[in-house]
Amino acid sequence: MKLLLDTTYLLPAIGISVKNVPKDAPIKLLRKGHTIFMSDISIFELSANGAKYVATGKLPAERVTRGIRAIVYNETIEKIPIHDTTLLLTAFKLRSLLSDFIDCLILSAAIDKCDALITEDQDIQNLKENKEFKGLLSSANPSFKIQTLKESL
């Protein structure tokens, strides 16, 4: 399956651990035979999160930059640009359903290019039962799924 990973699963690469998320989640998914994608906006999110940790002295800047470089240059993770017209138009539609536009961009990238979005985000998970969201999927990607990591492994 083509899976787009929410930024949460990439945070361990820059030195930020996330409760109940294994630091090797991308590797586990690759070993299961999945193709891994990420939105380019996740690089911004990783940088912003990393900056908070660097500013408070919890992480050295080099740890964050090394992790970001490792992700950017990792050829097993396919990157999806955020400037694609179709992706943006879908993100604009999603904005009425989600308050966080970064989440809209990530979800839109997944809908456009992948079989599923892997996320623990409750606001996104709640869309699975949303009538308007189901209508959007019926024309954009009818077989698309929103899953947690546990559901994907």
Model-derived features: positions:
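Short, well-structured N-terminal submotif of metal-dependent ribonuclease cores
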Residues: 1-41, 53-66
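Short amphipathic alpha-helical interaction patches enriched in hydrophobic/aromatic residues
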Residues: 11, 50-54, 75, 95, ...
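Short, flexible helix/strand-to-coil boundary loops that buttress conserved ligand/catalytic motifs
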Residues: 14-15, 50, 128-129
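Short, conserved catalytic or adaptor-binding loops enriched in Gly and charged residues
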Residues: 26-31, 69-73, 135-141
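Amphipathic alpha-helical repeat scaffolds of TPR domains
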Residues: 44-48
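Helix-adjacent hinge/juxtasegments
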Residues: 56-83
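Acidic, PIN/NYN-like endoribonuclease modules and their adjacent C-terminal/linker elements
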Residues: 80, 111, 115-153
